[in-house]
Amino acid sequence: MQVNDRVTVKTDGGPRRSGVVLAIESFSEGTMYLVSLEDYPLGIWFFNEIGHPDGIFVEKEAS
């Protein structure tokens, strides 16, 4: 994924929410994505863990 990509994010107890990637930070354990959501237009950070399917919170939106 890249900055400005449309994505969906997994949140606690609700449906996936649509947003836009504002920034990306890579770490050895995975990748942090700053995603602008309707409720958080300045962005909120989500972490995708490497090698753990349950740890994937940000996915690229289907075209």
UniProtKB/Swiss-Prot annotation:
It comes from Klebsiella pneumoniae (strain 342). Belongs to the DsrB family. This is Protein DsrB. InterPro entries: Dextransucrase_DSRB (IPR019717). It comes from the Bacteria. NCBIfam families: PRK10708.1.
